[in-house]
Regions:
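Residue-identity detector for glycine
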Residues: 10, 20-22
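Short linear regulatory motifs enriched in tryptophan with gly/pro/ser
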Residues: 24-245
Length: 245
């Protein structure tokens, strides 16, 4: 079992605790996110560069799923978002404060907090489109891989680094990765410092919630990586690219 899968599991656990999802216990061996009967496994693909595979309760709302996506991709919820279903003849879109958006654009806006994930995907292979930050136009394709009897870190997977806020979308991330892989030079130093500042802010935001501080520390403490107390620490998913001094 990879340490990256464990840290990704921890991020979803943080969301469960942070949003009052009934988090039960946190252990690499025996692990629950919520007291629910059905879990679904979702693969989230960002333009063929970054992907995350997570397990969430099927009765979570799309608003909660938005929170999970933000956590596992490393975004900070600075911008607007929407969900849609490919090929939907009604062109429905789910977002926050949907009533204020009706009449703008094409299709009907619905409230993401009032719609369960299971209402959009029911069988293996069903897809949901997620768009975040209409400036960068970050588009994530979500695919239902199936149901899971009980979530555990082995069900979680991650490919590629976190997607930094306001990085000009997929092209920006590709450029950042290319610079980070150089390992030295002026551009590398600038990117390293920028990433450290970005993820330090994210870590500080998470640790502002006492109810999740212990969970966060214990989950991330299971792996040999930068301490969350280290002001120079970056997201674990970036440790493949950056050396933390």
């Amino acid at each position: 079992m990879s340490w990256r899968a464990v840290t990704l599991t921890g991020r979803v656990a943080i969301l469960a605790a942070r949003y009052g999802g009934g988090f039960v216990r946190c252990s690499i061996v025996d692990y629950d996110i919520m007291r629910t009967m059905k879990y679904i496994k979702l693969r989230m693909d960002f333009e063929g560069i970054v992907s995350r595979t997570v397990v969430v309760p099927s009765d979570w709302s799309l608003a909660f799923l938005h929170g999970v996506i933000q956590a596992v991709f490393g975004w900070l919820d600075y911008h607007e978002y929407e969900f849609s279903v490919p090929g939907d003849p009604q062109k429905r879109r789910w977002t926050e404060q949907s009533a204020s958006l009706d009449g703008f654009g094409v299709g009907k806006f619905l409230e993401s907090s009032e719609t369960q994930i299971s209402a959009l995907v029911g069988k293996k292979g069903d897809k949901i489109d997620y768009t975040y930050d209409f400036g960068d136009c970050n588009e994530v394709e979500i695919t239902l891989l199936g149901t899971v009897a009980k979530p555990s870190p082995k069900e979680f997977a991650t490919e590629g680094p976190d997607v930094v806020e306001d990085s000009a979308g997929v092209g920006g991330i590709a450029g950042i990765v290319a610079i980070a892989k150089q390992g030295k030079g002026k551009e590398y130093k600038q990117v390293s410092e920028w990433l450290r500042r970005a993820f330090k802010k994210h870590i500080d935001d998470v640790l502002d919630y006492p109810s999740v501080r212990d969970i966060y520390t214990r989950v991330f403490g299971l792996v040999k990586t930068a301490s969350t107390a280290n002001p120079k620490a970056v997201s674990p998913c970036w440790l493949d690219y950056l050396v933390v001094h």
